[in-house]
């Protein structure tokens, strides 16, 4: 794409279409599993995900997600709010790029690393080196929990570390949730699980969004450790050499 147009990651990831206001693509959507991964009272949940019936600021309008005028096209019945609300269509300097949404660019930049990620990386190293319950790891994780308005009672277990990375860094281009699961050895099991979506409908009598029973949907995800444990070597790396062999399966 044209790099001077500004960040496109956010626009690519809001639900497909934009109610005739701006055309997004819906490439990445939160699952019900991610929604449920947040503890009760975790302020990051509503800052990360827009759930049916919630309001988002979009193209200068306050939109009730899933209402009669603003239906939901997302495969999971939800969409990402993080870095998106309020949505302002332009490049990173505020200049309009293309009002029909073909470029889906946003005034917001894309975070490549945050201080919270640094704290989580150190906590992970301490837990994996010294064992669960490490005192310094508890302090680091409690800093993350405090910011999310959660009790500062971290057990500093591997399970909590993994979940904190999932919740804190959801929908961030780097670090990648996929790469986390690969290096932990969790990717094959995670991708084999069915994906659940949130179902909802607009009740015209009540004039509100009503949440229905969730359902599974086929997301087409697979993970073969023999192939997907690593990425393919870029084609350009083979230029001028006969000593490289492409990774298996690519």
Where are each of the predicted segments found?
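An acidic, gly/pro-interrupted, aromatic-rich
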Residues: 8, 13-24, 29-49
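A generic "cationic amphipathic patch" detector
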Residues: 58, 129-131, 136-138, 150, ...
């Amino acid at each position: 794409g044209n790099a001077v147009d500004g960040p496109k990651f956010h626009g690519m990831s809001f639900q497909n279409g934009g109610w005739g206001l701006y055309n997004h693509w819906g490439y990445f959507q939160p699952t019900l599993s991610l929604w449920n991964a947040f503890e009760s009272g975790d302020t990051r949940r509503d800052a990360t995900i827009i759930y049916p019936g919630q309001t988002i600021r979009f193209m200068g309008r306050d939109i009730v997600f899933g209402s009669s005028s603003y239906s939901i096209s997302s495969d999971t019945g939800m969409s990402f709010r993080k870095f998106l609300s309020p949505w302002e269509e332009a490049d990173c300097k505020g200049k309009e790029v293309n009002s029909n949404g073909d470029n889906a660019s946003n005034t917001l930049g894309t975070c490549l690393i945050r201080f919270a990620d640094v704290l989580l990386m150190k906590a992970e190293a301490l837990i994996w080196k010294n064992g669960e319950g490490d005192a310094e790891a508890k302090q680091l994780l409690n800093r993350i929990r405090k910011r999310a308005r959660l009790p500062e009672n971290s057990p500093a277990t591997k399970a909590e570390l993994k979940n904190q990375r999932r919740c804190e860094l959801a929908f961030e281009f780097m670090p990648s949730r996929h790469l986390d699961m690969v290096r932990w050895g969790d990717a094959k099991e995670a991708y084999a699980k069915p994906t659940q979506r949130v179902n909802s409908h607009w009740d015209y009598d009540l004039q509100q969004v009503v949440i229905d029973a969730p359902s599974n949907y086929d997301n087409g995800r697979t993970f073969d450790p023999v192939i997907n444990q690593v990425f393919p070597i870029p084609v350009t790396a083979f230029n001028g050499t006969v000593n490289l062999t492409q990774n298996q399966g690519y």
